[in-house]
Amino acid sequence: MIDIKLLRENPDFVKERLKTRDESYLKLIDRLLEIDEERRKIIKEIESLRAERNEKSKLFPILKKEGKDTTEIQQRVKQIGEIIKNLEDKLQEIENEFNNILYYIPNLPAPDVPIGKDENDNVEIRRWGKPRKFDFEPLSHYEIGERLGILDFERGAKLSGSRFTVMFKEAARLERALINFMLDVHTKQHGYTEVWTPALVKPEILFGTGQLPKFKDDLYKIEDEDLYLIPTAEVTLTNLHADEILNEEDLPKYYTAYTPCFRKEAGSHGKDVKGILRQHQFDKVELVKIVKPEDSYNELEKLVNEAEKILQLLEIPYRVVLLCTGDMGFSAAKTYDIEVWIPSQNRYREISSCSNTEDFQARRAKIRYKDKDGKNHYVHTLNGSGLAVGRTLIAIMENYQKPDGTFEIPKVLKDYL
């Protein structure tokens, strides 16, 4: 959630930054400022009327004791009560409109984020490794998986519908091995605390990280219950400290968790229909950092390096891309994508997205810390995939494939199988 104080004091700055995402936000900001002004006037009027009512209520017993007529005061007190009630009803309507706009406004892009409309305007930062040159026509992961009988898309569809898969034998074991490998690297080498969290959360938890209300259509809701399946462990890990005030000496906090993730993939019709690249249910190891504001951008660079480490150990080529303003997620101030090389597509595909949300999520989730002087400040939160497990499986199957249609296991994983 953007800082209302910043919006009031420097609306041009807010509009300038949001314009780099989409010009349509400018009208929303103008309307938000209008409502805010109206809201503050009503609040001031209510406070003034309450003060008057309190003064007249104090006079009432004095006049009564003196035997004076109190009819006029009684009528005025009653009138004030009715006026306040009407103003409070009006204020509630205005508050609802204010929040309905505020909750849909994304984070302000950081100044060094490239300005652009979509993924075509993203900026490549670096590459690691060289794509393998095959002396045969490389197969796709789903061709390899079907031929080996380890990926079964028909049975996945029979059980659950489209974009679901059943894994057998080597695929199932490799999925499990990758999860354990990723968690071990992040906990033993990068200092993260491993966490196990629920996969079902309350709506206010999804509000805290920015999925609700804007992305309601991409979430799975439990019928007749006010619970949602998580689209990422970012939701649960970040909200571990919702409505809390942390001590400065307890920061930074690094959390990692493996969870299944659930997404309707609204708007993805026709994209990546074959294979396991885009599923309604998928496994992911998530990384979340809760840090002091002055540390957050250094922590973002570290976060990207920590996610990269997994691919380096697996010896799979990838590149790091800085997302432009038009391609960034709703809550992000700055995002790097890590894209892994997929031989069958002859291109890089996203396997991790690492973001600094600054205090955007912290404001929504009310996560603060107390400094040495006793003052409270919002933390900065960061999140990233470390990594998407299914996409890592794809990358291994394709980059390590052999002419006979099988594939090798990366050296670093052999102790996990």
Swiss-Prot record:
Pathway the protein acts in: Aminoacyl-tRNA biosynthesis; selenocysteinyl-tRNA(Sec) biosynthesis; L-seryl-tRNA(Sec) from L-serine and tRNA(Sec): step 1/1
A Gene Ontology cellular-component term: cytoplasm
UniProt-annotated binding residues for L-serine: 232-234, 286, 385
Pfam families recorded: Seryl_tRNA_N, tRNA-synt_2b
Binding site for ATP: 263-265, 350-353
Keywords of the record: Aminoacyl-tRNA synthetase, ATP-binding, Cytoplasm, Ligase, Nucleotide-binding, Protein biosynthesis
Molecular-function GO term, any one: serine-tRNA ligase activity
CDD domains per the UniProt record, alphabetical: SerRS_core
EC number(s) given by UniProt: 6.1.1.11
Enzyme class, UniProt record, top EC level: ligase
InterPro entries assigned: aa-tRNA-synt_IIb, aa-tRNA-synth_II, aa-tRNA-synth_II/BPL/LPL, Ser-tRNA-ligase_type_1, Ser-tRNA-synth_1_N, SerRS_1_N_sf, SerRS_core, tRNA-bd_arm
Family according to the record: Belongs to the class-II aminoacyl-tRNA synthetase family. Type-1 seryl-tRNA synthetase subfamily.
Physiological role: Catalyzes the attachment of serine to tRNA(Ser). Is also able to aminoacylate tRNA(Sec) with serine, to form the misacylated tRNA L-seryl-tRNA(Sec), which will be further converted into selenocysteinyl-tRNA(Sec).
Assembly description: Homodimer. The tRNA molecule binds across the dimer.
Free-text comment about domains: Consists of two distinct domains, a catalytic core and a N-terminal extension that is involved in tRNA binding.
Protein name: Serine--tRNA ligase
UniProt source species: Sulfurihydrogenibium sp. (strain YO3AOP1)
